[in-house]
Amino acid sequence: GTKNAYDNYYLANPYKQMILSGKVGNKELDDKVRRLLRLAFHTTLNKNRPLGSVASAEHVEAARKIGEEGIVLLQNQNGTLPINLNKTKKIAVIGENAVKMMTVGGGSSSLKVKYETLPLDGIKKRFGKDAEIVFARGYVGDPGGEYNGVVTGQNLKDNRSEKELIDEAVKVAKSADFVVFVGGLNKSEFQDSEGADRKSLSLPYNQDVLISSLAKANKNLAVVLVTGNAVSMPWVKEVPSILQTWYLGSEAGNALASVLAGDANPSGKLPFSFPVKLEDNGAHKLGEFPGNKEEIAAGKGKDKNNPINIKYNEGIFVGYRWHDTKNIKPLFSFGHGLSYTTFEIGKV
């Protein structure tokens, strides 16, 4: 699934089959390739640039390092992370986002990565020689993989009930020395997608219940949140360690594994505040979003020809400005981010 994600992108594979079968010739294909090459040659800054400078080993290393530096360590009680391999011989990886492709993107970007290292793959590569790695799905979110015309090729269909999935995950968690939960959001509709807002600040797909269940099953737990924005965390006091990874790109799995192992010291900081609840944000506290209740009741907002009027009364007091002005304590503050480094202050 991760190697042939774009075989069915628009005309890719169907057109190839038409050429191979002799239904069409290469004339049109050659013309399109010439146009791409012409643009590439005309726009390059260095006409002597050697071939093979796309997705090179240096680019892979840069992608991994960027991923490592973007990870934010939100919480790490009792030094739960990094994983101590002297005490860990079995690691349970739980969660759909551990095996789900996240680099795909359609629309104007038409993003096509050469490869993607998934979290489970990265963890197996880094820890597999020293510990047994086991996996449980935990929840079913988006079993498909089509985003704005790009098809990943993955098929993550699973017909088990939420109870069956959680029961399996808890059983696996109890059998392990350490648990890494990889969850969060994805790029399906009403998640981290364009053209639609999220329906809730909460994690979807029953993940809150799953995380609480895992916390009861194993105290050595790291929650890895793959999201593009804030989520509520009703279980925040139940889990010892939380990593906010965002979407880490093609080296996601290796970057995450490096931080989990302590090969890389997490140094990322939050670019905005995470609220405890939705009403801690000005737009929601003032009652203006998603619009005037009377207008919504009258049927407005259903299409672009019948819009809802929303007045942003909070003005410049958005994010941390609203929290500071109203003395609202966020879940995690703008600029927050821990590391594995410990400090001691001597006599002053």
Where in the sequence are the language-model features?
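Hydrophobic helix-and-loop "lid/oligomerization" segment in the mid-to-C-terminal part
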Residues: S53-S56, A136-K237
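Secreted, periplasmic, or luminal enzymes acting at the cell surface/secretory milieu
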Residues: A5-G107, L111-L120, K124-D130, V134-K157, ...
